[in-house]
């Protein structure tokens, strides 16, 4: 493969901006071990401005070039993009839509798959359509008395619920409600993040994760890892990334081979069915009765030093740098 100009786009300006920068560091380290790539790291900030690590303001044009505000700098042609952006506008499919419009190849899921997975409403519909068990739920599209009434009925039926903004990631806009006293305020808060809200039955279960990815044209689903939270808590954004997090992670969950096989089969089924590409982290619940429930899909999982995706990939016996090179090469040949 000839010399390739690779744009490493990171940030995004959303709630997961800082995590995106840490993941970009991981990519930079891996790309440094691959010959044939010229890498330019560009950060997208909260104001929608692009700038390099040196602070040069720039933009990605429809001519597939990075054009600098300082016109004395020559435009930098782009052959390939890694959109290392968690949440909006990366996992939402927005940035991928632009790449597709200008015919620029990129790493990760396409715009439609990203959008379908990120939105909890469409994701739930897909899970059910594919015949994959998932948590009981209701959908709401407006914060009003009827929405409050429906949620109160769900709380009465299920005993405890999670109220989730439909279009947010990493547990942002997600609230556990055990009492009717906190229901309306949590619902209002969730609607402040998204025009659609999902109300799910609280599941008392183990939280398992599978790294599902493509390698040399094949779909790989690792053995499930596990997130172990403190009693009566869930894996919030703060629990994921706080220095004093009480959550414990296991790269390989202590479950039977039969359960592991069934979970991995579900992961491959949803990867194929929703037409994912290159990488994903697929999260499941496992109840005390050994019922498997698909929870959610992350189409661009974190790649920080504590993230599960790279750990599970390595535990499976694969090398991240080789995996990355394989997927980039397959698109450029």
UniProtKB/Swiss-Prot annotation:
Record's GO cellular component terms: cytosol
Residues reported to bind Mg(2+) 2: 296, 298
Catalysed reactions, as listed in the record: 2 D-alanine + ATP = D-alanyl-D-alanine + ADP + phosphate + H(+)
List of residues binding ATP: 154-209
Claim: Cell cycle is one of the keywords in the record: no
InterPro entries the record matches: ATP-grasp, ATP_grasp_subdomain_1, D-Ala_lig_Van_CS, D_ala_D_ala, Dala_Dala_lig_C, Dala_Dala_lig_N, PreATP-grasp_dom_sf
EC number in record: 6.3.2.4
Coiled coil: none
Cofactor requirements of the protein: Mg(2+); Mn(2+)
Compartments in which it is found: Cytoplasm
Family that this chain belongs to: Belongs to the D-alanine--D-alanine ligase family.
HAMAP family assigned to the protein according to its UniProt record, in alphabetical order: Dala_Dala_lig
Summary of the function given for this chain in its UniProt record: Cell wall formation.
Full protein name: D-alanine--D-alanine ligase
Species, as recorded: Shewanella sediminis (strain HAW-EB3)
């Amino acid at each position: 493969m000839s010399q390739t100009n690779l744009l490493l786009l990171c940030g995004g300006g959303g709630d997961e901006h800082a995590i995106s920068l840490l993941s970009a560091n991981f990519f930079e380290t891996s790309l440094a071990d691959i010959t044939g790539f010229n890498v330019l790291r560009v950060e997208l900030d909260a104001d929608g401005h692009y700038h390099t690590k040196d602070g040069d303001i720039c933009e990605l044009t429809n001519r597939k070039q990075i054009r600098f505000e300082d016109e004395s700098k020559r435009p930098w042609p782009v052959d390939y993009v890694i959109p290392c952006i968690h949440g909006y506008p990366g996992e939402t499919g927005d940035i991928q839509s632009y790449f597709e419009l200008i015919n620029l190849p990129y790493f990760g899921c396409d715009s439609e798959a990203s959008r379908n997975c990120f939105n909890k409403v469409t994701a739930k519909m897909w899970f059910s359509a594919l015949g994959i068990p998932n948590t009981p739920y209701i959908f709401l599209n407006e914060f009003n008395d009827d929405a409050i009434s429906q949620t109160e009925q769900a709380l009465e039926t299920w005993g405890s619920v999670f109220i989730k903004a439909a279009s947010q990631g990493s547990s942002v806009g997600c609230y556990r409600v055990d009492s009717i006293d906190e229901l309306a305020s949590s619902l209002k808060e969730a609607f402040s993040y998204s025009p659609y809200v999902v109300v799910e039955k609280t599941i008392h279960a183990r939280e398992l994760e599978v790294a599902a990815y493509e390698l040399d044209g094949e779909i790989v689903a690792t053995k499930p890892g596990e997130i172990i939270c403190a009693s009566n808590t869930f894996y919030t954004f703060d629990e994921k990334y706080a220095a004093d997090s009480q959550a414990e992670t296991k790269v390989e969950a202590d479950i039977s081979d039969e359960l592991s096989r069934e979970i991995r089969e579900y992961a491959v089924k949803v990867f194929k069915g929703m037409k994912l590409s290159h990488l994903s982290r697929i999260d499941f619940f496992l109840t005390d009765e050994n019922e498997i429930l698909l929870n959610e899909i992350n189409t661009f999982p974190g790649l920080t030093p504590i993230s599960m995706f790279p750990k599970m990939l390595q535990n499976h016996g694969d090398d991240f740098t080789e995996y990355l090179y394989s997927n980039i090469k397959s698109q450029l040949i």
